[in-house]
């Protein structure tokens, strides 16, 4: 009886020790190595800034991820939209393309890829989303962004929340 009690105690201690030490370091949350800041504005079909639309700021792009954010149509503003991405480290050599993707909730979803050359010379990039489609509901845009080493544009106010999808 006494030996069984000692054996059960030893088994319990070894189980707890194994579960504590076996996964050590597995679920550590990594700290961002770099911070890239993007200032994203909505503009109308004449490339004029739509002042009724809040600015979107994107932070912490660590690898070729997809950054998803939402722009909501407001009453009385232009229905035709594009998105402008301003960053000192964004300078595409090829035309930025957008592809409409069907959405289950009948909300248009667009994706765009930004290609950055060696050296990353400073430039402001216009990314047209759609000149033909009226945006009358909340629309989600997915922007595929390569990894950058720096970004020094920051927004002033009225930022939307931004989610990062690897």
UniProtKB/Swiss-Prot annotation:
The gene is adg1. Residues 1-22 form the signal peptide. It is found in: Endoplasmic reticulum. It comes from Schizosaccharomyces pombe (strain 972 / ATCC 24843) (Fission yeast). This is Protein adg1. Keywords: Endoplasmic reticulum, Signal. One of its GO terms (cellular component) is endoplasmic reticulum. Its main location: endoplasmic reticulum.
């Amino acid at each position: 009886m006494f030996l069984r009690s000692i054996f059960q105690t030893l088994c319990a201690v070894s189980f707890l020790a194994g579960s504590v030490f076996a996964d050590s370091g597995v679920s550590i949350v990594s700290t961002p190595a770099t911070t890239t800041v993007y200032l994203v504005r909505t503009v109308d079909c004449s490339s004029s800034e739509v002042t009724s639309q809040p600015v979107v700021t994107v932070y912490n792009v660590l690898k070729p991820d997809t950054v998803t954010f939402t722009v909501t149509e407001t009453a009385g503003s232009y229905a035709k939209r594009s998105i402008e991405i301003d960053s000192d480290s964004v300078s595409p050599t090829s035309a930025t393309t957008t592809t409409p993707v069907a959405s289950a909730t009948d909300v248009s979803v667009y994706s765009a890829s930004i290609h950055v050359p060696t050296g990353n010379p400073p430039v402001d990039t216009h990314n047209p989303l759609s000149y033909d489609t009226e945006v009358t509901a909340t629309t989600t845009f997915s922007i595929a962004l390569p990894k950058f080493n720096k970004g020094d544009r920051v927004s002033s106010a009225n930022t939307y929340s931004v989610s990062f999808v690897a």
